[in-house]
């Protein structure tokens, strides 16, 4: 596993609090995509807009969500602001925001803390969790909580990394985890 999103409300709280704290300009850009009346609950507003059937509504929201998430996923992003001109372009609209909005608007089709409450079912199954130390999307606390309940899981923190596989060390750590798991289960 690379980063764990198992407590949807906690992860959204983390994004909602880390975005204005670490990237205040990006947060302003993120809010400015929304009408003034929808800014009090921006995450829910984005879900509604991304899932709206009108491309005039869903494309700018999906682009803003996707780009904001990309910036938050990197430990040292190249850009820290949204490109306002690119938000309305229909070229290359990312699919991920549509899938995420559907799942997250439905609490990932899980009850609150279901992943952690059901961790006992993982007993006897080996696992490795690769976790970027500075992951703002899937905070390390969730991986830590899961590994504490899943005794056969090993958590490997990657220092100086966020969520993305493109951060230094994350891809290598994931590849090593795959090789280590293959070695373990082939015995």
What are these regions (language model features)?
Residues 111, 136-142:
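Conserved alpha/beta-hydrolase "acid-adjacent" motif
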Residues 1-11:
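Active-site nucleophile loop of the alpha/beta-hydrolase fold
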């Amino acid at each position: 596993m690379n980063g764990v999103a198992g407590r949807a409300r906690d992860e959204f709280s983390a994004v909602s609090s880390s975005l204005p704290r670490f990237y205040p300009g990006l947060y302003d850009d993120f809010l400015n995509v929304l009408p003034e009346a929808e800014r009090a609950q921006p995450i829910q507003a984005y879900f509604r807009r991304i899932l709206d059937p009108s491309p005039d509504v869903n494309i700018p929201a999906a682009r803003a969500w996707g780009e904001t998430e990309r910036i938050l996923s990197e430990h040292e992003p190249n850009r820290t602001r949204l490109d306002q001109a690119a938000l309305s372009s229909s070229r290359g609209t990312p699919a991920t925001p549509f899938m995420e909005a559907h799942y997250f608007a439905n609490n990932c089709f899980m009850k609150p803390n279901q992943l952690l409450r059901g961790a006992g079912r993982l007993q006897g199954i080996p696992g490795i969790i690769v976790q970027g130390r500075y992951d703002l999307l899937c905070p390390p606390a969730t991986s830590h909580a899961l590994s504490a309940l899943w005794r056969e899981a090993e958590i490997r923190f990657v220092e100086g990394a966020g969520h993305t596989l493109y951060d230094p060390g994350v891809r290598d750590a994931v590849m090593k985890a795959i090789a280590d798991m293959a070695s373990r289960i082939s015995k």
